[in-house]
Amino acid sequence: MTSSLYLSTTEARSGKSLVVLGILDLILKKTTRIAYFRPIIQDPVNGKHDNNIILVLENFRLQQTYTDSFGLYFHEAVSLASDGAIDQVLDRILAKYRHLADQVDFILCEGSDYLGEESAFEFDLNTTIAKMLNCPILLLGNAMGNTIADSLQPIDMALNSYDQESCQVVGVIINRVQPELATEIQAQLEQRYGDRPMVLGTIPQDIMLKSLRLREIVSGLNAQVLSGADLLDNLVYHHLVVAMHIAHALHWLHEKNTLIITPGDRGDIILGVMQAHRSLNYPSIAGILLTADYHPEPAIMKLIEGLPDAPPLLLTSTHTHETSARLETLHPALSPTDNYKIRHSIALFQQQIDGEKLLNYLKTIRSKGITPKLFLYNLVQAATAAQRHIVLPEGEEIRILKAAASLINHGIVRLTLLGNIEAIEQTVKINHIDLDLSKVRLINPKTSPDRERYAETYYQLRKHKGVTLAMARDILTDISYFGTMMVHLGEADGMVSGSVNTTQHTVRPALQIIKTQPGFSLVSSVFFMCLEDRVLVYGDCAVNPDPNAEQLAEIALTSAATAKNFGIEPRVALLSYSSGSSGQGADVEKVRQATAIAKEREPDLALEGPIQYDAAVDSTVAAQKMPGSAVAGKATVFIFPDLNTGNNTYKAVQRETKAIAIGPILQGLNKPVNDLSRGCLVEDIINTVVITALQVK
């Protein structure tokens, strides 16, 4: 499984690029199979690519393209979210993230830039993305120009929000700290968060990293280079507007790497500053920026051009004060070619941050489970790769047709629809369903030439039960029996039905024709409960009204196998109204016996029972009621003692938590047949078809 980290910040210009460079350099010492991903990037200005993506791709020579390296533009995310289509934002991000993550050992995600006015939206979006991707978070704060309290307040608020969303945070770094405040801020971090398993660190404000190079000023101000083009890498630590007499101006010239800003017609200042630059009694300057589009006199230019060590001379068309104001709006960006700044950034990160401690936290993080978005994405990808053939008997139902449209248009499965073909075509046309019926096999069981062959097969299977061939012909006009026979004979890989028919109408033909797998005494069911931050398995909530201890044990083991097959680590809780040995009575004794049977059959499986629901999901309750249990507090598979309890519980959880419930998914059959709820939505049908495709052996 790919290791990951999500770098998130609390405000703009926190110096994320330094931390990105430091982390990737750290990880590269462990593995070369790394990737870098930005879920959201700023809209391109004049066609320019995102600077941080180019910086990373070129500096670390990663084997990924620019377009692979980001999800979507900020304006796209805002527009879709405003239209209530946040799921489209997340789906696009997830697809591109998985494309990279599936090829590497580690992926670093860098959050958005907070350059607009939607900072609250950005924070929530970054939190949602990190949670969806199951990425631990490294939180980066910005102390530039802030007091200690102002630097720590956004960190407190962010951590509180992450805690509420059950996000895992592996570190807090405060960047751009004034050196004189570094010790106190570090002490405050330790005092506030030292009891949490996190890396805590500060990175001091660095004058070189915060300073523009002259070439950035030339670009930002659209300035001309009059001389010194080979010195545009000079760093500008300060800038000074000079309009007074040169004798007075020199009094203010006491910082090195200063950019002098003066009108272009002030030849006295230009020459005086040039001489000061050469003098051992004054600091060297970064350059001279002339304003108001005034070119120096030709004689002055001739003099400057003859000086061997003259600083660069630049010219801009704006007046002096406007030029100075525009200069304040420019911010340095780490260029992919600025090797000195890149090396300095990495060295500063290594010096200030305990990288090995961060790596250890990343290694020891135990995921609570796969997130719903990731779970469903993985299922769809696997089903698409498998290209199974699924039969949908209720082909005239509008929800089935809408689901079929999505499945076909996205190339997830191959489909056969059963029903009156003219009725199917009419329903598609009247309801403007985007389904190309030429890509779907349509069969009317009542007129199909295959019905006679299917009837003969059914007759052979059921004649010992008194079924005649004439009866078989009549039975095979039923869509459920016809679809089930297609699966039995290998003419379809699986079947999904039940949107307008009962569970028995779906299950009975499967039991009669497909039958249970060897070693299975019954067919049972599970629901995949896609909660906000994890996916759980509930069984049996649909088929067996009151299983005995043997049957309950079988349901538990089958459900655990189903969970494992779908990427969920099985930790099985057999539920009852009491935990451990505290309760008595026939109901709890049945669960106790079922647990013993299941443990005997699979001793290596993490399994606990009887256990109450709260002890199964809540670590605090688990510590009190069942200390030391491998399941209590972290169960992923929940086995209910009877249908009444299971069905009501799954519906209550679904309603109260807005969870997506996928199922019921049938277990124990020789070939996959699955039932739908009659109240199912189009999305439920799609999910069940995907699951069915993946149950095919």
Curated annotation (Swiss-Prot):
Involved in acetate metabolism. It comes from Synechocystis sp. (strain ATCC 27184 / PCC 6803 / Kazusa). The gene is pta. The keyword Translocase does not apply. NCBIfam families: PRK05632.1 (NF004167), PRK09653.1 (NF007233), pta (TIGR00651). The N-terminal region seems to be important for proper quaternary structure. The C-terminal region contains the substrate-binding site. Pfam families: AAA_26, DRTGG, PTA_PTB. It is an enzyme of class 2 (transferase). One of its GO terms (cellular component) is cytoplasm. It comes from the Bacteria. It catalyses: acetyl-CoA + phosphate = acetyl phosphate + CoA. Keywords: Acyltransferase, Cytoplasm, Transferase. The keyword DNA-binding does not apply. In the N-terminal section; belongs to the CobB/CobQ family. Pathway: Metabolic intermediate biosynthesis; acetyl-CoA biosynthesis; acetyl-CoA from acetate: step 2/2. InterPro entries: DRTGG, P-Actrans_bac, P-loop_NTPase, P_AcTrfase, P_AcTrfase_dom1, P_AcTrfase_dom2, Phos_Acetyltrans/Butyryltrans, PTA_PTB. This is Phosphate acetyltransferase. CDD domains: DTBS. Residues 374-697 are annotated as: Phosphate acetyltransferase. SUPFAM superfamilies: HprK N-terminal domain-like (SSF75138), Isocitrate/Isopropylmalate dehydrogenase-like (SSF53659), P-loop containing nucleoside triphosphate hydrolases (SSF52540). One of its GO terms (biological process) is acetyl-CoA biosynthetic process. It is found in: Cytoplasm. Its EC number is 2.3.1.8. GO terms for molecular function: phosphate acetyltransferase activity.
